């Protein structure tokens, strides 16, 4: 039976007692509106740990002034039913007032890693992410925490935060979960119109084109970026926010591709901004 915990003090007490008896804890932080991408991380945690805790908390600190905080889907009963079916032990579901009873006097600020890609598009976003994660890690005290590779920049930042702040936590990156037609699973996919949903499949197809070019030996970033942009402009009505290639996980601009690289794209449809990526050179 999955238990829903709503206070910081109770969650801390539970996890401290579990740790004192030698139990290992896996943690999957989410903002709810769960989909198969989230569930795949939770299944992995259930396999690898004695206890699995997830959080469902829509964190206001990571939303900008013109972003969809109020509109972000909230469906806690449905989320709990989903995680109960895969044997998640605890859902930490605090109110905003519980997590932030007073205005924070101290927040974290991400440096260079947040100056590109999503961080450049959404100033302050990753500061909000690492601030809430720092709190959640202190509350849950997990042995392992699971993050999706769809948010690869976030994954790189979280790994660096854990290293910089000496959190004794292993960060586990989980491969992107996709629909049958290739669209990356996302809570924001529900905002797409029927026509946009048909077009959105071309995000992953454009990355397949990039992968083919890479395998054929193309190492000039501007050539690969140009091919992706041309394909997206021909096959979607969305606004191409960004197509970029960086080294990974250092997120340095890569004009000539060497080593492991990260191709990221973002396309803004009428009510949803979708991101997708592929990491190459790790094989």
UniProtKB/Swiss-Prot annotation:
Compartments where located: Cytoplasm
Cellular compartments per GO CC: cytosol
Residues holding beta-alanine: 62
UniProt keyword terms in alphabetical order: ATP-binding, Cytoplasm, Ligase, Nucleotide-binding, Pantothenate biosynthesis
Main localization (coarse): cytoplasm
Active site residues according to the UniProt entry: 38
Keyword Ligase assigned: yes
Pfam families associated with the record: Pantoate_ligase (PF02569)
Enzyme Commission number(s) of this protein: 6.3.2.1
CDD domains hit by this protein: PanC
Enzyme class, first EC level, given as a word: ligase
Record-listed ATP binding positions: 31-38, 148-151, 177, 185-188
GO biological process, one term: pantothenate biosynthetic process
GO-annotated molecular function: ATP binding; pantoate-beta-alanine ligase activity
Reactions catalysed: (R)-pantoate + beta-alanine + ATP = (R)-pantothenate + AMP + diphosphate + H(+)
Subunit annotation: Homodimer.
Family statement: Belongs to the pantothenate synthetase family.
Protein task: Catalyzes the condensation of pantoate with beta-alanine in an ATP-dependent reaction via a pantoyl-adenylate intermediate.
UniProt miscellaneous comment: The reaction proceeds by a bi uni uni bi ping pong mechanism.
Protein name: Pantothenate synthetase
